Swiss-Prot record:
Alphabetically ordered keywords of this record: Cytoplasm, Cytoplasmic vesicle, Endoplasmic reticulum, ER-Golgi transport, Golgi apparatus, Membrane, Protein transport, Repeat, Transport
Gene3D superfamilies: Coatomer, gamma subunit, appendage domain, Leucine-rich Repeat Variant, TATA-Binding Protein
The protein's name in its UniProt record: Coatomer subunit gamma
Keyword Cytoplasm set for record: yes
Domain of life: Eukaryota
Membrane topology type: Peripheral membrane protein
């Protein structure tokens, strides 16, 4: 009875993990068993399992431990036990990246991969390729070629997949195996054919003509593997997108014809892949899309849950790009709302939300509410994203949608789920003025019982930004001050900042805010006390300019670049005053695009956004003498200076400093028989510019990206900074062996290569900024410290106000304010408000009044702290 009771208790506790309490030290000591003779296969398998478990649980072995374990493991090759041998292969693969001298087992693995025991061969190939590098690959090349065309499918697949892995480190050697891969394409085994196509494409993907020939050949043949056909469809789609075939020619394209014929394939997998590919292609018309949507509509009523899920997921993804076509499937989607598979039901209803009429919103929301509590957070986020899109489409329905979202906020859920809801409510508040009051009220209720610190801080920031301009700002004070009393120090500090914004923006509430901030000075936390004292001191001055600069429009510098600038200042001339205005601003928080693809929804933490300037700072810091230029003001996106398929490809990134520009040229040598040295770019400078330094690239081997720099000083006059530069790539060429990459001799010859011209524009020299309250900043700029330039233009190249706004934003490179970059439909008058900082720290505010009649008339007013900058920006439009 006692034994029965113990067994019953163990059963109640659930399954236990026999390896959960392993210690690395004791397991490594057990590896001594591997040296025993004869080999105890059963015991060794158990020890190897422990080692693999520890490694896969994240336990790290130092090189000495891994090497000792590896060499002990090699003794097990004397055993003929099949299971033990395969465990040894797994151990070799896991330890190969840490242990030293792993090539000692090459001969044993080569013997196994060429032996007669098929159970060994495939695993031996995988293990061998995990320890092989490009220097010793030629020794096993003959065996790899034989295995690729082996009659045993498992061996052939292992060789093909291992070849794909080796192609990343020894691409030149693997390219020589193309004939064997081509032969493997004729295999009757579906997996061999699939992997062979994958290897062939990888070998030829850098040669567009070779890929086109491969696809044209295979589309005319009949592939037996549905997996290979699916891959061929994807390759064909990539070629179509790269060629950018116009709509009227696309239907006659052999590639599109092939994809269309796959809609009639006998495999459901291929049919779906073809339909998915067609609906996601650009430049398609209704006639081309119709068969694909018919297939998806048919799959919606399939008895197989996988087909229903695939079809509705694809419809959900393209609902915003092809709403009319998806609407034809609405009846089928309505039927899927009650599907037993909740994932299918969720996708169906979110698709209907994206394409449905305004009158159906209430009915759909009622249907969602019946099962939303039963689905996972992952799919709840999909629902929230669909509601966000619906709010943008039907702003008058914000009350219904906001109430639904507030109900979801009160439910249980993880941080990412709650964040998606808060993001949506904030988006509605920012884009719909009518929804501001109700949105803020819902968020106030949420933070009363919010367990996520990051969300509470975000909401308090929003309340400080939007609350003072609501109809009755005083009603939010209680919610904010409650956080000071009840929350953690981080939230209390955010609440103090929010209170100060009410005091700065609402004179009627200033007296009460001063009392509350005075109480916060007694807080036990240093940060809270310091903030309260700081804001209290500023508010007591009753100076509007201080309110604007230090409370309403606080400096939002990039912390990484601010730290670097301060370190440089401390290492330099301390007598000179530190100028914070030259430090670039932090990346503006931009609302992420709504993902229509449910597979992209993930619970992984979001990495912090890094600006291009922060990314460039550490790399540029390695250049000699770069510190004297100051912090990076702006780094541009890369521009291509050559065609993508030329002998040498060069792209340029412009790093703008206060008085200098650093041209970064990323160079790639695509010729395997050439080794380049002393690579540099020679610029033809416009008048006023001066070259200060050229940093050449010493060596440029085949297929390695290397960088050369040119440092140029701007003219003293800002108006002369807009210019075009000629560029020539100069280098020394040495012939080399394509297999080794080593030059044949020490002697070379000088050569050059002409590059495309480059421009420095106004947008290159301006760092975007975002004003929380543009009108306050504009009014404050009406002073003697600010200078103004004004002009009127007729924009003949554009026909709509939205096109005009987009053009102005592109030319000037400024950040928009108050969502003025979006022009409401049906309007003939619009005002664009934007701001930024010119290199050197000159602030810029722009107000562009647009009127649409027969053309677009623009009245542009620019205010800046520098007259030359104001005139330069005005001239840029003309």
């Amino acid at each position: 009875m006692g034994s029965f009771r113990r067994d019953k208790e163990e059963e109640d506790d659930g399954p236990t993990n026999a390896y959960q309490n392993l210690e690395k030290t004791s397991v490594l000591q057990e590896t001594r068993t591997f040296n025993e003779t004869p080999v105890n296969a059963r015991k060794c398998i158990h020890i190897l399992t422990k080692i693999l478990y520890l490694i896969n649980q994240g336990e790290t072995l130092v090189p000495r431990e891994a090497t000792d374990c590896f060499f002990a493991m090699t003794k097990l090759f004397q055993s003929k036990d099949v299971v033990l041998r395969r465990m040894v292969y797994l151990g070799i693969k896991e330890l190969s990246s840490v242990a030293e001298d792993v090539i000692i087992v090459t001969s044993s693995l080569t013997k196994d991969m060429t032996g007669k025991e098929d159970l060994y061969r495939a695993a031996a190939i995988r293990a061998l390729c995990s320890i092989t590098d490009h220097t010793m690959l030629q020794a096993v090349e003959r065996y790899m070629k034989q295995c690729i065309v082996d009659k045993n499918a498992a061996v052939s697949c292992a060789a093909l997949v291992s070849s794909l892995r080796l192609a990343t480190t020894a691409g030149d050697v693997v390219k020589r195996w193309a004939n064997e891969a081509q032969e493997a394409m004729n295999s009757d085994n579906i997996m061999v054919q699939y992997h062979a196509l994958g290897l062939l494409y990888h070998i030829r993907k850098s040669d567009r003509l070779a890929v086109s020939k491969l696809v044209n050949k295979l589309t005319r043949s009949s592939l037996k593997s549905p997996y290979a056909v699916c891959m061929l469809i994807r390759i064909a789609c990539k070629l179509i997108e790269e060629e950018d075939i116009p709509s009227e020619e696309l239907s006659d394209s052999p590639l599109f014809t092939f994809i269309e014929t796959c809609l009639r394939h006998k495999s459901e997998m291929v049919i779906y892949e073809a339909a998915h590919a067609i609906v996601n292609l650009k430049n398609t018309n209704h006639r081309m899309l119709s068969p694909a949507f018919s297939i998806l509509q048919l799959f919606c009523s399939s008895p197989k849950a996988t087909l229903r899920f695939a079809a509705v997921r694809t419809l959900n993804k393209v609902a915003m790009t092809h709403p009319a076509a998806v609407t034809t499937c609405n009846l089928d989607l309505e039927g899927l709302i009650t599907d037993s598979n909740r994932s299918v039901a969720t996708l169906a209803i979110t698709t209907l939300l994206k394409t449905g009429a305004e009158s159906s919103v209430e009915r759909l929301m009622k249907q969602i509410s019946t099962f939303v509590a039963e689905i996972s957070d992952e799919f709840k986020i999909v629902v929230v994203q669909a509601i966000c899109a619906l709010c943008t489409k039907y702003p008058r329905k914000h009350t219904v949608l906001m109430n639904f979202l507030s109900g979801m906020l009160r439910e249980e859920g993880g941080l990412e789920y709650k964040t998606s809801i808060v993001d949506t409510i904030i988006t509605i508040i920012e884009e719909n003025a009518d929804a501001k009051e109700s949105g803020l009220s819902h968020l106030c209720e949420f933070i009363e019982d919010c367990e996520h610190v990051s969300l509470a801080v975000r909401i308090l920031h929003l309340m400080g930004k939007e609350g003072p301009f609501a109809a009755t700002p005083s009603k939010y004070i209680r919610f904010i001050y409650n956080r000071v009393i009840l929350e953690s120090p981080i939230v209390r500090a955010a609440a103090v900042t929010a209170l100060s914004q009410f005091g700065a923006s609402c004179p009627a509430l200033l007296t009460n805010i001063l009392v509350l901030l005075g109480r916060c000075q007694m807080d036990p936390d240093d940060e809270v006390r310091d903030r309260a004292t700081y804001y209290l001191t500023i508010l007591n001055t009753e100076r509007a300019d201080l309110y604007k600069n230090y409370i309403i429009e606080r400096e939002n510098c990039s912390l990484a670049l601010l730290e670097k600038a301060l370190v440089d200042h401390l290492n330099g001339d301390l007598e000179k005053r530190f100028d914070i205005s030259v430090v670039p601003k932090a990346a503006a928080v931009v609302r992420a695009e709504i993902s229509n693809d449910v597979m992209l929804v993930t619970s992984a933490p979001r990495p912090p956004k890094i600006t291009r300037e922060e990314e460039s700072a550490s790399r540029l810091a390695q250049l000699p003498g770069i510190q004297v230029l100051g912090p990076v003001h702006r780094s541009t996106a890369p521009i291509q200076l050559t065609e993508s398929e030329t002998e040498y490809t060069v792209q340029c990134i412009k790093h703008i400093f206060g008085q200098h520009v650093v041209f970064q040229f990323d160079c790639l040598n695509t010729l395997s028989d050439q080794f380049l040295e002393n690579v540099r770019v020679e610029l033809t400078l416009p008048e006023g510019f001066t070259t200060r330094a050229v940093v050449p690239c010493p060596k440029l081997p085949y297929n390695e990206l290397q960088t050369t720099y040119v440092i140029v000083e701007f003219p003293p006059d800002a108006g002369s900074s807009i210019a075009t530069f000629g560029a020539t790539l100069r280098f020394v060429v040495k012939d080399c062996d394509p297999n080794t990459g080593e030059p044949d001799s020490e002697e070379g010859y000088d050569d050059e290569y002409m590059l495309e011209d480059m421009e420095i524009t106004v947008a290159d020299q301006i760092q975007k900024s975002k004003k929380n309250n543009f009108q306050v900043a504009w009014d404050a700029a009406d002073s003697e410290e600010w200078l103004q330039a004004e002009d009127t233009f007729v924009l003949s190249a554009v026909t709509t106000l939205q096109d005009a706004v987009n053009t102005i934003m592109k030319i000037l490179g400024l950040g928009s304010a108050n969502l003025s970059e979006k022009v409401p439909e049906g309007t003939h008058l619009h005002t664009l408000l934007c701001s930024g900082t010119f290199r050197g720290g000159a602030e810029v505010l722009v107000r562009a009044k647009l009127a649409l009649s027969e053309g677009v008339t623009l009245n542009l007013t620019v205010r800046s702290t520098d007259q030359d900058v104001a005139e330069l920006i005005t001239a840029a439009i003309g």
